[in-house]
Amino acid sequence: MPDHSDADLRAAFRELHGRSLHGFALVLLLGDRAAAAALAGTTLEVVGADAARLRHPERAAAALRADLRRRARRARVARRLSDGQLATLAGLGIGAASARALGSMTLRDRAALISADIERFGEDDVATILGTSTPQARRAAATARRRYVERHPDGDLDAPPAPGSIGARVVAVSQRTMGGRA
């Protein structure tokens, strides 16, 4: 009888991490559905092959995002957001002003902001995702937060997104950083 334990483990790994990794990819790649799906799929396949070693859910999630971020550096991400990208991000609760602010940031800044403030990973996991030390990751997240706020226009703030959405977290981070102005 064949041993399906490796295949079963990889399937469970994909089931556990697939949706959230795809969401990370969608925001990181500014709503580019095709690129996000391709990168998330490749990352799940490659990193998932080592699923037995990645038993701790947060460490596995950080390892997946680190791999996806490295792969995304080679992806062409449009800085000018299309209507389709804006619609995709709106579906995640990220309004046009927030999307434009994210679009003006570097991939690394977006990864820092998403992992530290939206997904709320611990500092060590953010360091893994960014491929740096914990103190450097802490500084990178603070810099990304500051850059996001600087680029988010005060007069064109998004309507509050549905509670629990990624967009709610983006707006909450903005509000904390701006002292309640967002």
Predicted region positions:
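Short, Lys/Arg-enriched anionic-surface-contact patches
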Residues: 94-105
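DNA-recognition helix of helix-turn-helix
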Residues: 130-162
